[in-house]
């Protein structure tokens, strides 16, 4: 016969793990709680377990006897010594077996960590919990309690009322007065801090667990007790080793594993939080504090169990069945007097499942325990489900639907539903204004405070001290119509050949140069003259001090010349007119001067205030005179700046260099820009790694009016943006992110608003054909120029839609975007790599590469022309007169006709004209000459003509043949 481990455990009131451990200690190998154990092995285990319990079992049936009787039974030598040393009266009604039957108790009696709810009543037990005489296993005989852990006579309400014990059974750090207030024990019942080896530290405890008169050093004299509080028969580790206690709280008999090591158990073995029934059942629980029958997990693994052996989450009654356990006295907070206990039920009294005052005591316990926070293993009382939604929120001027829902702790769907009820169609990411948000929140019972906080996106301008201002070089912008010689003029000034390097011989982005004339520096900005570069010219005019307007003497004032004049006037910039190409025979400077007067520029020779200098860039004529005029105007303007401050300026141009990363050409307007400075331009920022001047030389600093190329930005800034030097990179990042978020919010606001009018417009737009384009260019300014030029090509029927524009080479990402959106890619001064080309061919994406902006515009124009619906034009081919009418069976009426002019073809459309009125228009059904079908009949011949679906042909009718010709439309 055999018995399973879990059955044996139930029989012995042990955990399966404890039984398995004990079986292994006697040489029986078992794998789990379902393993079978032979009867002889089970008997060996039973015998071994029952040996150390002789004394306890002898007195166990006498639980709850009156105080004097139990004292007589259990008083022993150890108890006597203690009584003598303490001089205290032994407390009654605690028999030895009642406190903690040790034989069959696999689990330690009390964890010592941070047990908030002590097990022992503090009221009548000032000196010691357990007599040590005949109770080798008892918890702690306390001066007046020789008979057990808890006096049962007067303590019906729990094992240890917690009068002045806020922190646990033996809270070891926060218990000022100890488990049992001892008068001279300020440090707690068993402080655990300095006690590595036992429940009661013996070395550093000046006051001891229970000051005993002649026992200054510990709870119990440790002479014969090297390892713990109470050496037990076969307990090698002591009563309660605390630090490295492999044996548990009070290992019993042959319990090598211990009940609960106290090292990592802050909350104690028996959390007292919500156990109204007391720590140990007092009535008929002869087998120990916790019946272990159904506990397949053994002793209670103590590893990472901070909450004690039994989680108290859902167990308001504690780990142990509380059926016949009178309610525990509620714990008290520090300073609260102990709650007086009613008399305990005596032997022979009828058991009640719970004390009749249980409900009242439970409420009292809740009230007393309310302020205590360190109760991790206490199950929280069931709380009412409350509405946690805030009643008051603070919102900005505008916010998204999702943000509003989050602030009100509501679902986004509820907010969207409210908006729909108000007639507002909104998505989760759509912004709504504060007024709408206030209405929505009001309907949901939330009050709203609107707080307008704009993120810092603008850096304050610092006023310069006039005493610190110094003269600076003038910034001169060269403007004019395309091919009028602006760059050639600059070449003549700089004695370089920039024009030769420009694609198509025209300037396609701003060039910034600095030259020195007579010891004075002048900064030149060369702007494009082509109509596509309006934005660039406007930027050039904004940052300049003087504008040189180049006009070809042989060409006169042209559209871009007029535009340049307007830009300069708008920026309030003085204009110097350079009449170029005077070396040509057909040049006529006077005509140019005359044309300029039409736009408000009257030259000095004619009594105006506009300086005009005739020059020849190729022949280098009058170049010095022009520069002298520039210096003269600059001197009159008294251009000054403070070089000793943080730099500010303008981004002239920006590009993405394959090796250097984002590169920006900047013009410093104030202060000095140094390598290592942190600059912020729009939503891009970074620390300057290197600076290069217009001649390609590396420089470490750049003063006012100096153009330099900077490296180190995190992204390509937009041309025309103002840059500032900031002290802190973190601050720069915050401002850049705020600007980027602001821009994104604006884009979302513009694209997500839906109304009936918008819907109608979009339906109409469905009839408009779109040419999607992706623009990639070498510099930011070229993208702008190309985009503006292409948008100007749009008509009411065909529209250019630039879906993406970026600086740098064409990448595979661009190809994928083009394939998804059915777009063509326009590359301006950039080339794709081999992989990108292969991907484009695979995806069937049309990639067009250009170096001259004219070509790009013309090609896009041609593509758009092909998308236009063609026009149809009617072309009359010939006329025939009906001379005779024939009625042919099964065919209908046929008109015998004579071709008057032109020709009649078989596939022509015809119209029948009678007396000058068109009476029918339709298809030609048959065309015959004699009895044969004819393809066409020319002038002067007769033929038979049958008209489809028309038989009312009469003599004298004129049949006119015509076709519709497709005519291509032009933009």
From Swiss-Prot:
Which region ranges are annotated with the description G4? 580-583
Q: Which stretches does UniProt call biased (Polar residues)?
A: 65-75
Q: Name one Pfam family in it.
A: IF2_N
Which segments carry the region annotation G1? 480-487
Q: Which GO terms describe its molecular function?
A: GTP binding; GTPase activity; translation initiation factor activity
Superkingdom in the source lineage: Bacteria
* Keywords (A to Z) from UniProt: Cytoplasm, GTP-binding, Initiation factor, Nucleotide-binding, Protein biosynthesis
Query: What InterPro entries is this protein classified in?
Result: EF-G-like_DII, IF2_II, IF2_N, P-loop_NTPase, Small_GTP-bd, T_Tr_GTP-bd_dom, TF_IF2_bacterial-like, TIF_IF2
The ranges of region (G2) come to 505-509
Its biological purpose is as follows: One of the essential components for the initiation of protein synthesis. Protects formylmethionyl-tRNA from spontaneous hydrolysis and promotes its binding to the 30S ribosomal subunits. Also involved in the hydrolysis of GTP during the formation of the 70S ribosomal complex.
* Protein name as annotated: Translation initiation factor IF-2
Source organism of this protein record: Desulfitobacterium hafniense (strain Y51)
The gene name on file is infB
């Amino acid at each position: 016969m055999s018995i399973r481990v879990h059955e044996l455990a139930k029989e012995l009131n042990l955990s399966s793990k404890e039984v398995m451990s004990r079986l292994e200690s006697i040489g029986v190998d078992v794998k789990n709680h379902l393993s079978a154990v032979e009867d002889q092995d089970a008997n060996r285990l039973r015998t071994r377990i029952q040996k150390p319990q002789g004394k306890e079992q002898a007195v166990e049936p006498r639980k709850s006897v009156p105080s004097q009787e139990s004292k007589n039974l259990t008083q022993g030598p150890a108890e006597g010594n203690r009584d003598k040393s303490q001089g205290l009266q032994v407390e009654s009604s605690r028999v030895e077996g009642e406190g903690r039957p040790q034989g069959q108790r696999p689990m330690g009696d009390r964890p010592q960590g941070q047990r908030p709810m002590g097990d022992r009543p503090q009221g009548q037990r000032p000196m010691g919990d357990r007599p040590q005489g005949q109770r080798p296993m008892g918890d702690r005989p306390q001066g007046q309690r020789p008979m057990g852990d808890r006096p049962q006579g007067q303590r019906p309400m729990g094992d240890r009322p917690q009068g002045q014990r806020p922190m646990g059974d033996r809270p070891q750090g926060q218990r000022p007065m100890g488990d049992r207030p001892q008068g001279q024990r300020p440090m707690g019942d068993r402080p655990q801090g300095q006690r590595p080896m036992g429940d009661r530290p013996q070395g550093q405890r000046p006051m001891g667990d229970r000051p005993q008169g002649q026992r200054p050093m510990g709870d119990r004299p440790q002479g014969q007790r090297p390892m713990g509080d109470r050496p037990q028969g076969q307990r090698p580790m002591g009563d309660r080793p605390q630090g490295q206690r492999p044996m548990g709280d009070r290992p019993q008999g042959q319990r090598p594993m211990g009940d609960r090591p106290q090292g990592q158990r802050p909350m104690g073995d028996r959390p007292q939080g919500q156990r109204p029934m007391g720590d140990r059942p007092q009535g008929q629980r002869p087998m120990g504090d916790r019946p272990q029958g159904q506990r397949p997990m053994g002793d209670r693994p103590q590893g990472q169990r901070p909450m004690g052996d039994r989680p108290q989450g859902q167990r308001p009654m504690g780990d142990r069945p509380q059926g016949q356990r009178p309610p525990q006295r509620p714990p008290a907070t520090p300073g609260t007097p102990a709650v007086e206990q009613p008399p305990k039920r005596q032997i022979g009294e009828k058991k009640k499942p719970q004390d009749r005052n249980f409900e009242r005591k439970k409420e009292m316990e809740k009230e007393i325990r309310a302020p205590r926070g360190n109760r991790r293993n206490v199950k929280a009382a069931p709380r009412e489900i409350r509405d946690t939604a805030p009643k008051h929120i603070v919102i900005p001027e505008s916010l998204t639907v999702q943000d509003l829902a989050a602030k009100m702790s509501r679902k986004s769907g509820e907010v969207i539903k409210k908006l729909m009820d108000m007639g507002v169609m909104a998505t989760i990411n759509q912004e709504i204004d504060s007024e709408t948000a206030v209405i929505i929140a009001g309907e949901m019972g939330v009050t709203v405070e609107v707080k307008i906080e704009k993120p810092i996106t603008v850096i304050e301008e610092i006023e310069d001290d006039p005493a610190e201002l110094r003269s600076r070089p003038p910034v001169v912008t060269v403007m004019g119509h395309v091919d009028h010689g602006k760059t050639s003029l600059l070449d003549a000034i700089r004695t370089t050949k920039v024009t030769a390097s420009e694609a198509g011989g025209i300037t396609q982005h701003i060039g910034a140069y600095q030259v020195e004339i007579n010891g004075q520096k002048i900064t030149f900005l060369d702007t494009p003259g082509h109509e596509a570069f309006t934005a660039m010219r406007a930027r050039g005019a904004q940052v300049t001090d003087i504008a040189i307007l180049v006009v070809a003497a042989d060409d006169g004032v042209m559209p871009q010349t007029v535009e340049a004049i307007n830009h300069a006037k708008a920026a309030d910039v003085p204009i110097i007119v350079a009449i170029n190409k005077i070396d040509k025979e057909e040049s006529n400077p006077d005509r140019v001067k005359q044309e300029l007067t039409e736009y408000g520029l009257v030259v000095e020779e004619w009594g105006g205030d506009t300086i005009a200098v005739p020059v020849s860039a190729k022949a280098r004529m009058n170049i010095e005179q022009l520069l002298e005029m520039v210096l003269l105007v600059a001197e009159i303007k008294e251009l000054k700046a403070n070089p000793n401050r943080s730099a500010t300026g303008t981004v002239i141009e920006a590009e993405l260099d394959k090796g250097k990363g984002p590169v920006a050409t900047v013009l410093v307007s104030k202060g000095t820009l140094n390598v290592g400075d942190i600059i912020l331009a729009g939503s891009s920022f970074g620390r300057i790694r290197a600076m290069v001047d217009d001649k390609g030389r590396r420089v470490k600093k750049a003063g006012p009016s100096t153009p330099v190329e900077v490296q180190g930005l995190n992204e390509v800034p937009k041309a025309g943006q103002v840059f500032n030097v900031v002290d802190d990179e973190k601050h720069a990042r915050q401002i850049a992110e705020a600007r980027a978020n602001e821009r994104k919010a604006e884009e979302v606001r513009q694209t997500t608003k839906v109304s009936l009018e918008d819907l109608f417009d979009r339906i109409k737009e469905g009839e408009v054909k779109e040419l999607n384009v992706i623009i990639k260019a070498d510099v930011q300014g070229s993208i702008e120029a190309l985009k503006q030029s292409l948008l100007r090509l749009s008509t009411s029927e065909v529209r250019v839609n630039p879906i993406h524009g970026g600086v740098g080479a064409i990448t595979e990402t661009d190809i994928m975007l083009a394939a998804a959106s059915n777009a063509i890619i326009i590359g301006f001064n950039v080339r794709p790599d081999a992989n990108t080309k292969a991907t484009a061919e695979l995806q069937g994406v049309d990639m067009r590469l250009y170096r001259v902006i004219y070509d790009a515009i013309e090609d896009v124009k041609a593509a758009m022309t092909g998308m236009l619906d063609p026009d149809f034009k009617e072309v009359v081919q010939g006329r025939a007169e009906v001379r005779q009418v024939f009625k042919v069976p099964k065919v209908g009426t046929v008109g015998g006709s004579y071709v008057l002019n032109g020709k009649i073809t078989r596939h022509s459309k015809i119209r029948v004209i009678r007396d000058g009125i068109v009476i029918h228009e339709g298809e030609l059904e048959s065309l015959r000459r004699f009895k044969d079908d004819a393809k066409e009949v020319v002038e002067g011949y007769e033929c038979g003509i049958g008209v489809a679906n028309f038989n009312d042909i009469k003599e004298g009718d004129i049949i006119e043949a015509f076709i519709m010709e497709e005519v291509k439309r032009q933009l």
